[in-house]
Amino acid sequence: MDRGEQGLLRTDTVPEEAEDAAATISATETLSEEEQEELRRELAKVEEEIQTLSQVLAAREKHLAEIKRKLGINSLQELKQNIAKGWQDVTATSAYKKTSETLSQAGQKASAAFSSVGSVITKKLEDVKNSPTFKSFEEKVENLKSKVGGTKPAGGDFGEVLNSTANASATSGEPVPEQTQEGL
């Protein structure tokens, strides 16, 4: 093999993030075969340790899940607990306390303002009701009502009105509309 083909068949590892590829190539060229072999053994050992730690972590996570299952802790309960804890943390902050206090004061002021507006409106309506113009209008409406309605008593339910109409028809000698229809 010539030198160009050897470069294509290199067995060096791919540089990690933020590692300069040119520095890696030049560093391996300055290391002896023995040093490179030592580093390869160390690399294999570290990779094996990482694999072992990954397996241990997986076993610990499985054990954790088993303990939670036995305690009756499920994902939904964990989520609820996390949200409750997060809310508790938020409400404990000074920013939340200041905001809450400010909003409470604003609410009290708004409530007082609405109460004041309601009182003013009520007073104005009473003033209008007691004004001579309104009294004159009220009298005119009452006069119109008495002229249109006559002296009929106010109120009464539908049955009373129906009975009084039937009685009035019977005394006048006119047949009740139902009788007229039956005769046809």
Curated annotation (Swiss-Prot):
Q: Which UniProt keywords apply?
A: Coiled coil, Phosphoprotein
Q: Has the keyword ATP-binding been applied to this entry?
A: no
Q: Which GO terms describe its cellular component?
A: cytoplasm; endoplasmic reticulum; perinuclear region of cytoplasm
Composition bias of kind Polar residues appears in 162-184
Protein name in UniProt:
Tumor protein D52
Supply the source organism for this entry: Oryctolagus cuniculus (Rabbit)
Q: Which domain of life is it from?
A: Eukaryota
Listed InterPro entries: TPD52
One GO molecular-function entry: protein homodimerization activity
Could you tell me the gene encoding this protein? TPD52
